[in-house]
Amino acid sequence: VPNTRGYLSQETRERVAEAIAELNYRPNQIARALHGKSTQSIGLIVPTVALPFFGELTEHVEDFLADRGYRTFVCNSMGKADREQEYLDLLLSHRVDGIISSAHNDGLADYRSIHLPVVSVDRDLSPTVPNVRCDNEAGGRIAAEHLLKRGARRPALLTSRTGTHNLREKGYRQVLQQADIEPVVLTVDFNTPDAERPGLIRERLELVADDVDAVFATDDLTAAQVVEWVEDQGLRVPEDFKVIGFDGTVAIRRALPALTTIQQPIARLARAAVNLLLDQIDSMASASSGDRDSERREKHLRSPSPMGVRLLPGRTT
């Protein structure tokens, strides 16, 4: 029975169930939303499903939401701000109960203004949107320290965007400053088309080929492309050149078991994001029914502490 609130006899329930089966009835979720009821649906916005991190994150989020009785609308923005905005508008028009976003586009004002539960993963969307993330700064330090311990004299950082917001870069710079080594930071923008990315990575590396002997790449696919470039130069990994990545997804560990990387707790990030979002949804429902516990609602708007990462040693360092 679609709505089981109130008393129904077993005989009535069976008759309704038979009628539903015969008519192939499907609840109209938007109509339910217009009547103030939950649509039991969540929007998930990711910048790409091509990177294993976001593919694995999506899988876990969808799985955890299904366990709680929610459907997931997966929106792949392809790293484009206009497409992300379109998906955001679409999700709002479909009256989803909440949104989980791992967007890579800064400045979308709607995240700060929509009256809907929102949680971000590894991105600061707004001071009012809780952010679930790993300890990126610690990960940057661990990666740089590992390269130096393995004998690297001048490790470079290869990342998607540089600046104070890049905490992996911050950790890398801290370690090199302590070792009195000048940082070498190379960038290939996150939104670079896949077909162009390998060529740009090679261009960046060739500019510093004579000056560096190791690379910390802030994602594992980039690290794999660095390994290919090193081998094309006739150098040996790790004897002549060392490489470490970041993410440690199941797919990469299966495809490239030799790659040294910093592993994020992706399943834990996904579960935390789901739990935090559903807590917000429950809190808003309680508020609308007269519960004025503002302290409890504020708790669900605070970002949790960053989750720890770990070094997965391989044969590339």
Regions from the PLM with identified roles:
Residues Q29, P47-E56, V74-R83, V132-I142, ...:
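Hinge/beta->alpha junction and helix N-cap segments in small-molecule ligand-binding domains
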Residues V1-S38:
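N-terminal helix-turn-helix DNA-binding module of bacterial transcription factors
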Residues K37, S41-E145, K149, R204-D210:
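Alpha-helical recognition/docking segments in bacterial nutrient-uptake
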Residues V1, N24, S38, G69, ...:
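Conserved functional loop/turn residues at catalytic and ligand-binding sites
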Residues E203-T317:
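Flexible loop/turn connectors
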Residues I114-V118, I181, P238-F241:
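A short helix->loop->beta-strand "cap" motif at the edges of active sites that frequently abuts
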Residues A19, H60-F64, D110, L167-A179, ...:
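Alpha-helical structural signal in soluble globular domains
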